[in-house]
Structure formats: C-alpha cells, structure tokens
A protein has these predicted regions:
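Active-site beta-loop-alpha junctions enriched in small/polar residues
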Residues: 21-28, 58-65, 107-109, 137-139, ...
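Charged (often Lys/Glu-rich) extended helix/loop segments that serve as interaction or gating elements
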Residues: 97-186
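Active-site glycine- and acidic-residue-rich loops that bind
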Residues: 1-3, 26-39, 79, 108-113, ...
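Short, surface-exposed linear patches
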Residues: 1, 39-44, 80-83, 124-127, ...
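Acidic/histidine-enriched ion/cofactor-binding microenvironments in catalytic or ligand-binding pockets
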Residues: 47-49, 53-56, 75, 79-82, ...
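Active-site-proximal beta-alpha core segment in soluble small-molecule metabolic enzymes
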Residues: 1-57, 66, 87, 92
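Short glycine/threonine-rich loop-to-helix capping motif typified by GTGT followed
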Residues: 29-36, 67-80, 111-125, 181-185
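Short glycine- and Lys/Arg-enriched binding-loop motifs that mark or flank ligand-binding interfaces
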Residues: 14, 20, 57-61, 103, ...
C-alpha cells in the first residue's frame, strides 16, 4: 500500500517526499533507535527503487527514553548516534541516498531531566490505604493520572528514614489524581 500511495501521489504532482514513523515511546535501550533507523532506511531504499520519487527526509521520530526510576540505566546518546550513523552509511549511502536529511524528535530525552515539580504535603489520611495529599494536582503533572506513568518522588524534608507505603494524591476531586500508588516513601 505504501509503494502504491507514493506512486499515486507522484502522479498527482507531488515532488518532495519523506518518511516518518512513530513506533515506540520512551524506550530505554541503546539498540532501539539504530534498529528503527535500519528498518526505515531499508524501507526508504525500497520506496525509491520502486517509485522513483525524490526522498528528502526520514524522520526517526522520538522514542529515546529517559530513566524515570533512579535504578534504570540512562540511554547513551553517543552510542545511539553511532548506531544510526553506521546503518546510514551501510544502507542509504550505497543506494545513492546519502543526501537524505535525518530528523529526530528528542524533546523528552533532552528536557525531562531538567524539569521538577515541587509540592508540599498538605495532609495525611489513613483508611484502607494511607493517602498523602499534596498541594499540586494532575493539572501540574498529567502523565500519572492519564496513564499511570511513573515519576520519581523524593521527600526533601526527610529523604532517608523509616518508610511506609502510600498513595500520593493531588487536590482535585478526581479518583485518578494520583502521583503515585502504593509507593514506599519516607
């Protein structure tokens, strides 16, 4: 279908083409991005050989993840870049596609480690669970409420010491306004 779509678009007068993919989000492996590049570069060669279109760019999208949990190893962007460069040289250059621009969308990778949400505990409630209420909410950090994303929480007043399992909840009257569920914290 993709080859046919390129052919039909070329027949309609489109002159500049590109390939863009979004296959994963927040991968924490140095191997993912070079493998994605290999697949897209091979696809690009196939498209150009079968359609004769001028391919101007390949967008590898995002996907290079960050270590949200302290025990996770961070991605090494130099290793990732070397891997992409290797497959570029092995696949695109021999096919005469060394001119193709390579784009990325690495916003999370570049910025995630620079953002913090600082909030205060406003109350603690014990029922069938222990809830720690804070003066922030999903309005300030939507990812945990929206799809359960993990964000590390540090108790700046007492980073060490006895811990307890708690839910850290926001100030909204919504059952999913939670920054952490059943998290062991000091």
């Amino acid at each position: 279908q993709l080859i046919q779509a390129f052919i039909e678009l070329k027949e309609l007068g489109v002159e500049e083409f590109g390939i863009h993919a979004l296959l994963a989000s927040n991968t924490v492996s140095n191997d993912y991005y070079p493998e994605l590049a290999r697949q897209l570069f091979e696809l690009a060669v196939e498209v150009v050989e079968n359609t004769g279109v001028h391919l101007g760019f390949i967008n590898l999208s995002g996907g290079v993840g960050v270590n949200y949990k302290p025990e996770q190893e961070p991605n090494d962007i130099a290793i990732i870049g070397e891997g992409v460069h290797r497959v570029f040289d092995a696949i695109l250059k021999p096919a005469g596609l060394g001119h193709v621009k390579i784009y990325t969308e690495l916003g999370r990778f570049m910025l995630a480690s620079h953002g913090l949400l600082v909030t205060r505990v406003t109350h603690k409630k014990k029922t069938y669970r222990t809830y720690v209420g804070v003066d922030a909410s999903a309005v300030n950090l939507l990812r945990p409420a929206m799809y359960g994303a993990y964000h590390h929480i540090t108790n700046m007043d007492r980073p060490e010491g006895p811990t307890e399992v708690v839910d850290v909840v926001g100030s909204l009257c919504e059952n999913n306004d939670k920054f952490a569920k059943q998290r062991e914290l000091p």
